[in-house]
């Protein structure tokens, strides 16, 4: 089980990223646009720097929905490997069968 503080920190980052996503995309479009002037780009860069650092989607970490474990995460299921195995053994994931050969 992951520390609750780490799970909450990641939840806060996701919330901030969602809040500032539209503004961030607008500013990045101005910066990357070849039609915008140098002054516009500079102003957009300054405004982008004013956005909180934790609002960047890169700072988010994929975590297991049940345990909060950051490693061994399967995107398709949203679970860590050990929770995925436990759920598969209990038959909680439809269509998932363990292979044996």
Swiss-Prot record:
Q: Which GO terms describe its biological process?
A: translation
Highest taxon, organism lineage:
Bacteria
**Which region is the signal sequence?**
none
What Gene3D superfamilies does this protein's entry cite?
Answer: 1.10.287.1480
* Cross-referenced Pfam families: Ribosomal_S14
Asked if the Swiss-Prot or TrEMBL record annotates the protein with the keyword RNA-binding, the reply is yes
GO MF term (any one): rRNA binding
Entry keyword Glycosyltransferase: no
What are the annotated GO cellular component locations? cytoplasm; small ribosomal subunit
Q: Where is the composition biased (Basic and acidic residues)?
A: 1-10
Q: Sorted alphabetically, which keywords does the UniProt record give?
A: Ribonucleoprotein, Ribosomal protein, RNA-binding, rRNA-binding
Q: Where is this region: Disordered?
A: 1-20
Record family assignment: Belongs to the universal ribosomal protein uS14 family.
**Which PANTHER family does the record cross-reference, listed alphabetically?**
30S RIBOSOMAL PROTEIN S14, SMALL RIBOSOMAL SUBUNIT PROTEIN US14M
Protein purpose: Binds 16S rRNA, required for the assembly of 30S particles and may also be responsible for determining the conformation of the 16S rRNA at the A site.
Quaternary structure?
Part of the 30S ribosomal subunit. Contacts proteins S3 and S10.
This one is known as Small ribosomal subunit protein uS14
Organism from which the protein derives = Halorhodospira halophila (strain DSM 244 / SL1)
Q: Which gene encodes it?
A: rpsN
